[in-house]
């Protein structure tokens, strides 16, 4: 069964009795599916099963093509309104030089201007694991350079061999 054919319509409805509602909101009550199909054909519309789990099943007399079009339109609108959060990651080490920090901060500011989130990751190697505070100090130093352009989403925290900090762009 294809994804589009999730609803039963017209002759596919096998229930003996159904609760029928018209396209204009008129309630036909509990009638046989043959009778409902006859009403739908007379009006030039389709009989569409709305709630198969109900006792008796609920069907609606409507234009199925128009209904499907409206459903697809709603899905497209919902998809447009979804905002994908893009997170850029900038990797650093504890022994990074100041000019390299400036270069990485410049890139981070470009990402923030584009509306992207930035995660700073300080990788701790070997003996640096004994003093992870050095990573926190480095991230605090970077934070002082970008605090006018960004909001700190997460304080510097430890995750395994990394010290992470997440920053987001300031709202205009």
Curated annotation (Swiss-Prot):
Keyword Transport: no
Keyword Nucleus: no
Transmembrane segments: none
Gene3D superfamilies: Translation initiation factor 3 (IF-3), C-terminal domain, Translation initiation factor 3 (IF-3), N-terminal domain
Keyword terms, alphabetized: Cytoplasm, Initiation factor, Protein biosynthesis
A Pfam family matched in the record: IF3_N
Subcellular location: Cytoplasm
GO cellular component, as recorded: cytosol; membrane
Homology family: Belongs to the IF-3 family.
Subunit structure comment from the entry: Monomer.
The protein's name: Translation initiation factor IF-3
């Amino acid at each position: 069964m294809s994804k589009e054919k999730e609803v039963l319509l017209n002759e596919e409805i096998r229930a003996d009795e159904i609760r029928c509602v018209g396209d204009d909101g008129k309630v036909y009550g509990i009638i046989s599916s043959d009778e409902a199909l006859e009403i739908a054909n007379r009006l030039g519309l389709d009989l569409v099963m709305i709630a198969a789990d109900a006792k008796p099943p609920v069907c609606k007399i409507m234009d199925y093509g128009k209904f499907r079009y409206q459903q697809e339109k709603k899905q497209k609108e919902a998809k447009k309104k979804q905002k994908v959060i893009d997170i850029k990651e900038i990797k650093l080490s504890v022994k990074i030089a100041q000019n390299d920090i400036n270069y990485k901060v410049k890139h981070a500011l470009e990402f923030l201007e584009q509306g992207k989130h930035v995660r700073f990751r300080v990788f701790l190697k070997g003996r640096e694991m004994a003093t992870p505070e050095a990573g926190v100090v480095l991230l605090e130093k970077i934070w002082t350079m970008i605090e006018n352009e960004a909001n700190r989403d997460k304080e510097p925290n430890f995750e395994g061999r990394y010290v992470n900090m997440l920053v987001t762009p300031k709202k205009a």
